[in-house]
Design a protein with these regions (language model features):
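Signature of N6-adenine DNA methyltransferases within the class I
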Residues: 10-11, 17-23, 45-53, 77, ...
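Conserved acidic residues
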Residues: 39, 121, 331
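Hydrophobic/aromatic beta-strand patches that form the interior of the parallel beta-sheet core
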Residues: 42, 81-83, 107, 171, ...
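C-terminal substrate-recognition regions of SAM-dependent nucleic acid methyltransferases
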Residues: 8-12, 205-433
Length: 447
């Protein structure tokens, strides 16, 4: 192991980008940009210069109109800028992209304080995600939270948009968390511009791509600095191609299953979404005390979470001295943090004593039962993957993609995967994709 390099990774958030991924990102960029010898290119956090090397090679291939090889090299190097904060990488950058005959724009400086006197046509790269320490994630068992790093990729994105020409292009790979509209407002920041294409990777896929050096869902994209139109092309893993997706009205951008979300969209527009029926629970008030065991004082039953035991969903229960929220009400309780696994609390037997569970209240027994059946299918599990913005958590945003089942009069009261696939018009290929996506034989609470 290169100990010095590992220390740089932890200190500066540096994770090398594999060449196959760089190649795929470059394929997003319109070919005419590589042909224009006047365009200026920038990698603002170039590390060893991997992006710069492939951009250089692509420019050399595309700019054959400059017949003289040396003149072509000189022109390209004049317009290709590689920035890196850490002197540690300088020699490696020169090895990858430097040319003894011509000057190279290899600049060792802090990008966030750099003030160039030019604007760029294309900015591309893998910006550092953090500085001053790795970001703590649920799968990072070593790092302590108090040593958590400062997120940098947001600053790099904003700085890069400032440094782009009007109409210029930004192509980065960054965490996927901006794809949901939240308090950070990065969704709004991105969608004000034209998003041409986006390809997303789960936390598992990201970790594999970066050889166990990255632990968060990620995406790469091609953005143009022109007014956005609420449309983009999302990569669909089922069809292995990019599909159109419209995100008007601040609709979240899914990280998975765009073909299915597009199938459901007309029903969401007709019936509304299930989101308004779903309540995300908060922590209980300090006035309520809880205990693991039932005693004379602690008599009120509550759900804290749901776990899997040999693929069987099982509620985790505690007891409180006073009733917790939602006790005494007929409801669905989705307490499993990844798959929900709705429990039908017909008689209001349970309160909810912990945060980040989901509750659906309704007094119509048959429709609530139908909703439980829907949300327990492989169809639903496939949908839940669409909003895995933070590791593998079940996000409330997914319910914006699901039509309001309570209003769908023509939907069978007895639901399974076959019923749903037929109702929403899925073909055999799509049905097979859903049925084979997760093959574990989960035993849910559906009777």
């Amino acid at each position: 192991m290169d100990v010095e390099k590992e220390n740089y990774k932890e200190k500066y958030g540096d994770v090398p980008t594999p060449y196959f991924l760089i190649k795929e990102m470059l394929e997003l960029i319109p070919n005419n940009l590589f042909e224009n010898s006047h365009n200026k290119w920038l990698d603002p956090g170039c590390g060893e210069g991997s992006f710069g090397k492939q951009v250089y090679e692509q420019l050399m291939f595309n700019q054959i109109h400059i017949v003289d090889i040396n003149e072509r090299r000189k022109t390209i190097l004049k317009n290709l800028f590689l920035l890196e904060k850490n002197e540690y990488y300088e020699e490696k950058i020169k090895e990858n992209i430097g040319d003894d005959m011509f000057d190279s724009n290899i600049i060792i400086t802090d990008y966030l304080t750099w003030e160039p006197n030019i604007k760029f046509d294309v900015i591309i790269g893998n910006p550092p995600y953090n500085s001053g320490g790795l970001k703590k994630t649920p799968t990072n068992k070593v790092l302590k939270k108090e040593k958590d790093g400062e997120t940098l990729w947001i600053q790099f994105v904003k700085k890069s948009l400032e440094n782009l020409k009007e109409g210029g292009y930004l192509c980065f790979i960054i965490p996927s968390i901006w794809l949901k509209p939240d308090r950070a407002k990065m969704y709004e920041y991105f969608t004000q511009y034209k998003l041409h294409k986006i390809k997303c990777f789960s936390n598992t896929e990201t970790n594999k791509i970066f050889k166990n050096n990255a632990q968060t869902p990620s995406c790469f994209f091609l953005l143009q600095k022109v007014k956005g139109d609420n449309n983009t092309l999302l990569y669909d893993k089922c069809y292995k191609t990019y599909m159109n997706y419209n995100f008007k009205n601040s609709l979240p951008i899914p990280v998975h299953g765009v073909f299915l979300i597009n199938k459901l969209k007309p029903y969401v527009e007709k019936y509304g979404s299930l989101e308004k029926m779903v309540i995300k629970t908060n922590s209980i008030t300090i006035r309520i005390k809880v205990n693991k065991e039932k005693t004379d004082k602690y008599i009120h039953k509550n759900v804290t979470t749901c776990v899997l035991e040999d693929n069987k969903a099982s509620l985790v229960i505690n007891y409180s001295d006073n009733p917790c929220n939602y006790a005494g009400k007929m409801k669905l309780i989705m307490a499993h943090k990844m798959y929900g696994f709705p429990y039908f609390d017909e008689f209001g037997e349970y309160g909810i004593s912990s945060r980040d569970n989901y509750v659906i209240l309704n007094e119509d027994y048959k429709r609530l039962l139908r909703c439980q059946q829907f949300l327990s299918t492989k169809f639903a599990i496939y949908l839940f993957e669409s909003t895995r913005y933070r590791m593998k958590y079940l996000e409330k945003y997914v319910f914006q993609f699901i039509p309001d089942i309570f209003k769908m009069e023509d939907l069978s009261l007895c639901i399974d995967d076959n019923v749903l696939c037929d109702y929403f018009g899925l073909n055999e290929f799509e049905k097979e994709e859903i049925m084979n996506f997760n093959t574990k034989p989960y035993k849910t609470f559906v009777k």
